[in-house]
């Protein structure tokens, strides 16, 4: 009988609850942070991919505009080479300066 009495009357430490750590809360929070890290990594990769695509587009656009401007300048030069020099027009333009 004495054995049963001791089992029922265990004295609990008063500070047991305050010093007890909740492991379940940490376990629940841990997957969220790893998922956030994965999402951030995926977003970072997407942003880098889009930046590279825009840089390539800008380079292509610059090359395209250069080729267009060179073609137009060459056409103007060819057009002016075929015409005789207009001295009166040249003197009028110089007078405006």
From Swiss-Prot:
Subcellular location: Nucleus, Nucleolus
Keyword Nucleus: yes
Example GO BP: ribosome biogenesis
InterPro entries assigned to the protein according to its UniProt record, in alphabetical order: RBIS (IPR031389)
Modified residues (N6-acetyllysine): 21
Nucleotide-binding among keywords: no
GO CC terms of this entry: cytosol; nucleolus; nucleoplasm
Modified residues (Phosphoserine): 19, 69
Predominant location category: nucleus
Pfam families linked: DUF4665
Keywords: Acetylation, Nucleus, Phosphoprotein
Signal peptide segment: none
Role played: Trans-acting factor in ribosome biogenesis required for efficient 40S and 60S subunit production.
Subunit structure: Associates with the pre-60S ribosomal particles.
Protein name in UniProt: Ribosomal biogenesis factor
Organism of this sequence: Mus musculus
């Amino acid at each position: 009988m004495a054995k049963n009495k001791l089992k029922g009357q265990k004295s609990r430490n008063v500070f047991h609850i305050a010093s007890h750590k909740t492991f379940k809360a940490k376990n629940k929070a841990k997957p969220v942070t790893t998922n956030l890290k994965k999402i951030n990594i995926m977003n970072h990769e997407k942003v880098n991919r889009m930046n590279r695509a825009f840089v390539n587009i800008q380079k292509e656009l610059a090359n395209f505009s250069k080729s267009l401007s060179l073609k137009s300048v060459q056409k103007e030069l060819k057009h002016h080479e075929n015409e005789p020099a207009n001295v009166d027009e040249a003197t009028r333009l110089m007078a405006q300066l």
